[in-house]
Amino acid sequence: MTKTLHFDCLSGISGDMTLGALIDLGVSVDQIQQGLHSLNLPDLKLRTEEVKKCGFRAVQIHIDHPPEKAHRHLHHIDAMIDEATEINDSAKALAKKIFLCVGEAEAKVHGCSLRKVHFHEVGAIDSIADIVGVAIAIDALDVQHATSSTIPTGTGAITIDHGRVAVPAPATAEILTGVPLMACDIESELTTPTGAAIIKTLARSFGPPPAMTPLRVGYGSGTRDLEGQANVLRVTLGELTEASSSQGQIETDRVTLLESNIDDATAEQLANVSELLMSAGALDVWQTPIVMKKGRLATTVSVLCDASRIGALQTLLFTQTSTIGLRRTEMNRSKLARESQTVETPDGPAKGKTVRLPDGTLRFSLENDEVKRLCAATGKSADQIRTEAQAAFAAG
């Protein structure tokens, strides 16, 4: 049976809450400690404490280490992980993937290259311990699947190295693009950049738990006390049922459909608006010809987006078209698990996309821009380029 984890993030998610919950599921503290020491952090000590939040027990994590002022770059952290002798390759890969998620967000919000990004809070020893510790724990649990509830960010303002900012912090907001958010009016930072990166990297879908048989439940505690609810993260370890396993590669999320009927725009104007909408973060944009009242020909402009982009996209539609009203529909979406992949063709590396079908088989498709690029460079037909790319993918 396929083992899975489901994260219930009613009070948000952070690195220490995640690590505490995974340890509460039964992962050995000594195993995590041994792996952390091999990061060339011999003075680091991981301690656990059983606490109560609103009357419920949970595991709270403490990271003890000498004070430091170092601001590390991503390549420094990657090197630390690569050189760790007591961490499995799969745990190393997961930890580096989580750090990359944070690094890409930091690069975007600060307007610099990934290599020049230097980590502040996330580069501190306790955050390194949280992320690497979580990766070690996930590897120890041997889970192949994870899902999560929608994510609350909290509200209000916090002070970081760059000054006072609104919640969620800029990096957190960037990481959570495309992730369904939970409505929340608690004035506190519930989800940190570390927690956001962990859940975005791990979770295949956001919403209710899948059909599964629960095996164990772990609770990780946050440091603050919240009014009216326990500041804990609940993580359930279970086995997917047969029906759920057969759909294990199908992800689900919530998206919003914005639509407007426009009868006084040219084809060029609508094409330009579509490009602007995609650049502003729409998941997809399409146009449908319709006949309106009085027999007028018109076009329905449809925009698919996640909740975080609704405001920006509807503002763009109101300012860039003549529409005076929009329809908004919330809907569930199912999609195959996918990831970017580069294959080595006879004409050099080419970027494509791999999706995993419900029966577990993989399907590869070359990006159309890559097809055009290779056709222009080689004079080959598009069919030949695609055939060679498929052969390269099949050869591994």
Swiss-Prot record:
Region Disordered, annotated ranges: 333-355
Record's keyword terms, sorted: Nickel
GO molecular function: lyase activity; nickel cation binding
InterPro entries hit by this protein: Ni_insertion
Domain of life: Bacteria
Matches recorded under PANTHER family: NICKEL INSERTION PROTEIN-RELATED, PYRIDINIUM-3,5-BISTHIOCARBOXYLIC ACID MONONUCLEOTIDE NICKEL INSERTION PROTEIN
Family: Belongs to the LarC family.
Protein name: Putative nickel insertion protein
Organism whose genome encodes this protein: Rhodopirellula baltica (strain DSM 10527 / NCIMB 13988 / SH1)
